[in-house]
């Protein structure tokens, strides 16, 4: 949140933003071969790039080569639009060559395939005939099979705020968030089986790359916050493959 567009963008003036310097202290003492950092996409241009340059200088002064790139989970087999800034520090004495971030795997996936069959949720469910009709128009469109891997917005409910936007699960999910308001807070709203609802905690785990045996908190709000703050497993896996 210190660097997020949806937050106040306090950056290093926010106490959470200064955690990086604690990480730097650990790196200085432990001297790991590789450092992997992740932050919101806006981190790369926060304060006109000064924040990123500060991180780069600190890392390079510790005798590491520094690389960064914005990657989207949607490009790595996960139906969630989640752009994040990934930063890599590689100790020069370990490997002084250029690091190349993984390329998109261009795998067509849909949120629909990551949903749970059994629904046991206290989340409100809505019906909206206009959205049902719009959904059919989209799905019957001759260009439908050529839709890019991204969220497909089909309408709104209530006042139409960010948390009131409704999406079709034939596309990708919007970015899971640890915060936010509105009816679809933290997950967004989706027209599923002709009903409008939020995603379940388990579905949030699914679109974050977590295995089915990953144990969820008994408190749904804890899980929503957890997946709003998490890194997507698939993206990290592809980065680690390139680091081998």
What are these regions (language model features)?
Residues 1-175, 181:
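Class I S-adenosyl-L-methionine
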Residues 134-244:
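C-terminal target-recognition/interaction regions appended to catalytic cores
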